[in-house]
């Protein structure tokens, strides 16, 4: 089954009900939300989410297990200085996700900043273990990054090494096509790209795909998303991910730019699903 959707707005007054309604209007069957502003740890109380309205009207069209939550960008579980704040926040975030019944929490691995990468790697593994020990049900997904600055997890070997070191069935990977392209993985050479995903064992842990085009050339380490078919990756390569059996049943989530201050996810989903 093809699962495709996008980031949708989780905002007052309708929160979860409104987000899933927007997804269905886009002809999606999966969705991704932030539980607050992406650049903030501010959160409203779960009783404001309009969970019962969602359950009454949309539960069957997009069930909770097909709702993906993204952690805010500003936390850094790989930093020995910031890890405690990040970990405490994520434990509370997972409690809110359990209230919804969602399955996955996507997390940027963080930056090693002034520390060595090895120190940051050990801290990240420790953070993930601590968060999982204090929570239940939700699966943490580390996201593949572009390698901008001191970002962690910009290559497949590193992210798989970290995931395997955590040693938990509740840890996995979210692959972002823009990020991995910018990190140097050539999606235009699709057979080789799939071979690399298998060789590094990343496929064993892949639970969600962020499907984005890139404004930047291969290996640029920029992390600038483009609309589908408007970037350097191109529609043909991104469409292959939709239909290739290797990625069957994995939710594909669009995080592409707005056009004229409006999302065009409905158009992009239709474009991707159109067989040529």
UniProtKB/Swiss-Prot annotation:
Cofactor info, note text: Binds 3 Zn(2+) ions.
SUPFAM superfamilies reported for this sequence: Xylose isomerase-like
Residues bound to Zn(2+) 1: 70, 108, 143
Organismal lineage: Bacteria, Bacillati, Mycoplasmatota, Mycoplasmoidales, Metamycoplasmataceae
GO molecular function: deoxyribonuclease IV (phage-T4-induced) activity; DNA binding; DNA-(apurinic or apyrimidinic site) endonuclease activity; phosphoric diester hydrolase activity; zinc ion binding
Cofactor(s) for this UniProt protein: Zn(2+)
UniProt-annotated binding residues for Zn(2+) 2: 143, 176, 210, 255
Function: Endonuclease IV plays a role in DNA repair. It cleaves phosphodiester bonds at apurinic or apyrimidinic (AP) sites, generating a 3'-hydroxyl group and a 5'-terminal sugar phosphate.
InterPro entries linked to this entry: AP_endonuc_2, AP_endonuc_F2_Zn_BS, Xyl_isomerase-like_sf, Xyl_isomerase-like_TIM-brl
Catalytic class of the enzyme: hydrolase
The reaction(s) this protein catalyses: Endonucleolytic cleavage to 5'-phosphooligonucleotide end-products
NCBIfam families xref list: nfo, PRK01060.1-1
Family affiliation: Belongs to the AP endonuclease 2 family.
Keyword Zinc-finger: no
Name of the protein: Probable endonuclease 4
């Amino acid at each position: 089954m093809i699962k495709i959707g996008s980031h949708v707005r989780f905002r007052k007054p309708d929160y979860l009900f409104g987000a899933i309604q927007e997804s269905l209007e886009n002809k999606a069957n999966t969705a991704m939300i932030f539980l607050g502003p992406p650049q903030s740890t501010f959160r409203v109380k779960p009783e404001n989410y309009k969970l019962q309205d969602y359950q009454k009207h949309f539960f069957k069209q997009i069930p909770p297990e097909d709702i993906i939550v993204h952690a805010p960008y500003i936390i850094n579980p790989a930093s020995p200085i910031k890890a405690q704040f990040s970990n405490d926040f994520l434990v509370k975030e997972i409690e809110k996700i359990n209230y919804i019944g969602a399955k996955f929490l996507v997390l940027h691995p963080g930056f090693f900043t002034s520390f060595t990468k090895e120190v940051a790697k050990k801290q990240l593994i420790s953070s993930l273990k601590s968060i999982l020990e204090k929570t239940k049900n939700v699966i943490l997904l580390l996201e593949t990054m572009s390698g901008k600055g001191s970002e962690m997890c910009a290559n497949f070997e590193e992210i798989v090494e970290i995931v395997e070191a955590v040693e938990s069935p509740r840890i996995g990977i979210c692959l972002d096509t823009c990020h991995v392209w910018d990190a140097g993985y050539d999606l235009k050479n699709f057979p080789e790209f799939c071979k690399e995903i298998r060789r590094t064992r990343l496929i064993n842990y892949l639970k969600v795909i962020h499907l984005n085009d890139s404004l930047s050339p291969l290996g640029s380490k920029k992390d600038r998303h483009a609309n589908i078919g408007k970037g350097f990756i191109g529609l043909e390569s991104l469409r292959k991910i939709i239909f290739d059996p290797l990625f069957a049943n994995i939710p594909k989530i669009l995080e592409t730019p707005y056009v004229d201050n409006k999302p065009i996810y409905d158009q992009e989903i239709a474009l991707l699903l159109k067989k040529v």
